[in-house]
């Protein structure tokens, strides 16, 4: 009886406490453009309660009834204070004004001290302003090149697409554009990304402690949010560069309610090169373009968004040879506020990646096309349950169509079809996560994602014999035909997530995290740098889902008079299962029996990341250093011993600095120093019928490392005096300032001056100093 009375007393106390609290909710927006502000901070004057806006600028905070003081702030914006007398739940939409230019601007977007207070670990957000400050190839600001300067991130060199995170392949990064995935984020074989920086709002990279709402890749999520469009006034901006130009127009359709944005880029390499081409190459083309469009509309508790992207790269050598590749995405989203504490987002997206290759002569022609298409619907919910609890939950279903090869050869005698059969899959997922802050010092996030992948007909399932020796090609044993919609294989995987934060002081904290990730899409490539026509394969009855368990812990510390310096040191260990590799001599192109050439093994990656940045003032930037190892072990390869991944770089040092000399001039520089990537060299050679054949010996893999990679880039920006509604600037940049000939690859060829002797040939993609000049403008 006594226990029941105590329980009733506790419940009554909780109810009385709840009755003395009210909710304040709404959106945080930029007053100059109407753009929503993600991760804005909302703080009660007592400091006992705080909240932040979500990806769509929505917030909800529970406060005591009566008079309260609330402060709203975000980087680069002026803090706004409210004195509210609250008797019931209230809606307060907040518009923050941009801070004056004289005030220091954050390099990487983040609230003061949020890196210490937040439970997030291994996560960085970069604003579009930061991206534009970093010196880049040919003076063009670039999203992916900026991401590659963050700790734990690397790539295999110039001319390579994508990026590598904590020992993962480029296919193990989920790259999202307004929530739609893109499968090749590069233009011009990796020199530029597909993201127009003028249309980008901000970019978030999550490497560890990955929340449960993200899934489908092992290593990271790169979430690129595009601008919604200015709903206050019309404006245009763009630039004229060395090899391409860009333009963006945005403005209100209905002021304060609806807006639009359109942005486009087009290179003119083919136009510039035409006068220097011989007559037989005058018709050649080499260009890329992209188009981004977006509209949004607000109505009461509802926000509607439609966005699209279309982009292509094309190379055509006088119609004798041609290759073309590109992405297309379309996204429709509906935000709905059910009540003050329940926010929802419903999304449908379409994404397609395709490439075409063609050869032709006077009497013959060959074409090859490949596609990966997915349609997806998902629902995400934020429930602001109590001042200390936030619960996220949702689900997603995605339908995939894989067209690995539509190949046709035509000549004077007829037509031959070498096309491969299509493949189909359905990926489903549900998730729930809770973030709990029981005290000011300690908070945690726990979540569970459950994913399912169905490999489906219409199509054939291939079954192979076990090889006589590990590492040998598997011979086909039988084929079974499945009808449309029939399930060939079904995989269900739980994916637990956990993260915590313990604040050791007002300016320091310890954080940790664990996440299991599952991946059902596999990029099959035998090159260190992915090429546009690599093969994407789904999980099948032969290819199992890739899995990774990652453990991360780190110490975060801010210091300086105004917390101007933020620092962190993190260490991680990642264990990977079902990593896909291939037998020696595998045929990866137009091979219907490709799965017989594939092997699976284990992987491991571990390392330490150090990060120091200065966020405000005339002098800003960051320094990061990463020591890491990424290895695999596959039976039948390298004598069944661990060997380095193709993208393993043990040491990576990045220095990014920006100094504002005056209102008109600023200088910036970045320095990169990295270990060389591994490659496979043969240990001997033998002669067959007069031909010299290399012998790797003991099926070695990645047994030699390329030389050190290092590079310095500099830029100077001159900002002209503003004229009414017109702003402009000139950017002079220098890529690879001291003319370093960094090796992209090393191969062997015959030295004709010493007959019969093979010599190592060092190949550099960019082996020279590259200057550039670009002009940027803005009208508003």
Regions found by a protein language model. Give the residues of each.
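Short, acidic, small-residue-rich periplasmic hinge/interaction motif at the N-terminus
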Residues: 27-29, 33, 41-45, 73-77, ...
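Periplasmic N-terminal accessory/gating domains of Gram-negative outer-membrane beta-barrel systems
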Residues: 76-78, 109, 114-173, 177-210, ...
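Transmembrane beta-barrel wall of Gram-negative outer-membrane proteins
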Residues: 241-268, 279-314, 322-350, 385-389
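Surface-exposed extracellular loop regions of Gram-negative outer-membrane beta-barrel proteins
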Residues: 354, 401-412, 454-477, 502-550, ...
């Amino acid at each position: 009886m006594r226990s029941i009375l105590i329980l009733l007393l506790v419940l009554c106390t909780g109810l009385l406490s709840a009755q003395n609290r009210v909710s304040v909710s709404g959106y945080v927006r930029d007053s100059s453009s109407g753009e929503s502000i993600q991760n804005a901070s909302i703080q009660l004057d007592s400091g006992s309660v705080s909240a932040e806006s979500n990806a769509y600028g929505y917030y909800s905070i529970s406060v005591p009834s009566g008079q309260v003081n609330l402060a709203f702030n975000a980087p680069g914006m002026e803090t706004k204070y409210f004195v509210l007398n609250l008797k019931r739940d209230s809606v307060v939409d907040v518009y923050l004004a941009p801070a004056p230019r004289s005030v220091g601007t954050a390099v990487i977007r983040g609230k003061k001290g949020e890196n210490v207070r937040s439970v997030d670990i291994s996560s960085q957000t970069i604003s579009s302003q930061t991206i534009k400050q970093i010196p880049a190839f040919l003076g063009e600001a670039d999203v992916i090149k900026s991401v590659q300067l963050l700790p734990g991130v690397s790539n295999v060199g110039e001319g390579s697409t994508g990026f590598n995170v904590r020992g993962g392949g480029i296919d193990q990064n989920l790259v999202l554009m307004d929530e739609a995935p893109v499968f090749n984020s590069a233009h011009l074989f990796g020199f530029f990304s597909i993201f127009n920086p003028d249309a980008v709002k901000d970019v978030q990279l999550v490497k560890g402690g990955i929340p449960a709402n993200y899934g489908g890749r092992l290593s990271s999520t790169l979430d690129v949010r595009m601008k919604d469009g200015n709903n206050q006034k019309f404006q245009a901006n763009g630039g004229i560069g060395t090899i391409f130009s860009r333009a963006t127009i945005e403005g209100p359709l209905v002021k304060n309610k609806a807006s639009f944005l359109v942005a486009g880029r087009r290179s003119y390499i083919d136009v510039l090169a035409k006068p220097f081409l011989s007559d037989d190459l005058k018709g050649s083309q080499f260009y890329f373009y992209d188009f981004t469009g977006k509209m949004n509309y607000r109505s009461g508790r509802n926000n509607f968004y439609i966005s699209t992207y279309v982009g292509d790269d094309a190379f055509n050598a006088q119609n004798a040879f041609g290759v073309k590749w590109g992405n297309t995405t379309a996204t429709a989203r509906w935000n709905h506020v059910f009540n003050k504490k329940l926010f929802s987002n419903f999304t449908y997206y379409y994404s397609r990646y395709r490439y075409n290759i063609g050869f032709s002569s006077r009497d013959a022609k060959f074409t090859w096309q490949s596609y990966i298409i997915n349609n997806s619907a998902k629902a995400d919910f934020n429930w602001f349950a109590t001042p200390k609890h936030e619960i996220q939950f949702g689900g997603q279903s995605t339908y995939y169509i894989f067209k690995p090869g539509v190949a046709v050869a035509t000549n004077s005698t007829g037509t031959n079809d070498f096309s491969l059969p299509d493949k189909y899959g359905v990926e489903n997922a549900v998730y729930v996560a809770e973030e709990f802050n029981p005290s000011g010092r300690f908070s945690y996030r726990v979540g569970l994602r459950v994913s399912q992948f169905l490999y489906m007909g219409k199509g054939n399932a291939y079954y192979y014999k076990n090889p006589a020796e590990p590492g040998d090609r598997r011979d086909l044993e039988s084929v079974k035909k499945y009808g449309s919609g029939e399930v060939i294989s079904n995989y269900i995987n739980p994916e637990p997530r956990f993260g915590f934060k313990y604040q050791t002081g007002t300016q320091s904290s310890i954080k940790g995290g664990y996440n299991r990730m599952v991946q059902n899409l596999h990029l099959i490539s035998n090159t260190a740098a992915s090429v546009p026509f690599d093969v994407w394969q789904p999980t099948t009855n032969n290819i199992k889902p890739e899995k990774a368990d990652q453990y991360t812990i780190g110490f975060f510390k801010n210091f300086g008079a105004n917390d101007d310096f933020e620092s962190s040191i993190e260490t991680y260990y990642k264990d990977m299962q079902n990593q896909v590799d291939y037998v020696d001599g595998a045929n990866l192109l137009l091979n219907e029996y490709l799965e017989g050439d594939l092997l699976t093994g284990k992987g491991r990656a571990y390392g330490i990341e150090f990060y120091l940045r200065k966020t405000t003032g005339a002098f800003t930037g960051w320094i990061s250093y990463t020591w890491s190892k990424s290895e695999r072990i596959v039976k039948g390869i390298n004598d069944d011993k661990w060997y380095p991944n193709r993208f393993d770089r043990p040491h990576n040092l990045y220095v990014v600095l920006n100094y504002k000399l005056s209102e008109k001039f600023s200088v910036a520089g970045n320095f990169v120093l990295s270990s060389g990537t591994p490659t496979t060299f043969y240990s001997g050679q033998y002669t067959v019928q007069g031909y010299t054949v290399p012998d790797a010996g003991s099926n070695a893999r990645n047994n030699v490392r390329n030389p050190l990679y290092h590079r310095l880039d500099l830029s100077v920006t001159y900002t002209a005096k503003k004229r009414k509604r017109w702003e402009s600037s000139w950017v002079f940049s220098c890529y690879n300032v001291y003319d370093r000939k960094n090796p992209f690859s090393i191969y062997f060829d015959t030295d004709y001056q010493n007959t019969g002797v093979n010599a190592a040939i060092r190949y550099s993609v960019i082996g020279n100093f590259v200057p550039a000049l670009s002009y940027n403008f803005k009208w508003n």
